[in-house]
Amino acid sequence: MVGEPKRHTAEDNAVTMTQPRQQDPAYFEMLYEKYATDVLRVSYFYLGDRQKAEDVTQDVFVRLMLNAPVLQEGREKAWLLKVALNRCRDLWRGAWLKRVVLGSPAFELVPAPDEIGKLADEQELMGAINQLPANFKEVILLHYYQGYGINEIAEMMDLPEGTISSRLSRGRKKLESILKGGDVL
């Protein structure tokens, strides 16, 4: 009908996928509204610094607008989170970022069905997670703290699901060893 406001639907996403990105600011706005919080949350957990996480979030969406990649429908979130993780890794490895402090009372630990989720002392757990190699730390944080499934993490990190499952399993074993007073190995 003429004069009625247009509602945003899944078909709108499909239509914008065929339009040039630089000419479709509504597409970028829709992606920002939908996924900025997820990008910020993942960045914050990785970096442990709200300001740096906000900078990464801004950088991700600026890259989206400038590069205008052709994204498959339904995979936009995976692309955004992958770019955010890569940017966080760059910052984390950078010489100016010497220390990573993960965790905050502002975000709750999502209980896991195994022993990791049963630990009473979250500070001890975060200290143990900080001792893990980066590849295990990433999947542990994304799965247990952010609640992403194995398939979502695999898509974000551009790795096979089996690799993610293996890293989760090995990461849990390493955490158990650390918490019992052993080395990371």
Locate each region found by the language model.
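A short pre-motif secondary-structure segment
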Residues: 139-143
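Residues within helix-turn-helix
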Residues: 51, 151, 162
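Arg/Lys-rich amphipathic alpha helix in sigma70-family domain 2
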Residues: 82-103, 118, 170
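Internal acidic/polar
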Residues: 9-13, 98-127, 149
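DNA-recognition helix of helix-turn-helix
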Residues: 85, 157-181
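Structural recognition of an alpha-helix C-terminal capping motif at a helix-to-coil junction
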Residues: 55-62, 66, 74-86
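C-terminal flanking helix
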Residues: 36, 40, 61, 133, ...
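N-terminal module of bacterial RNA polymerase sigma factors
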Residues: 1-38, 45, 121-122, 126-130, ...
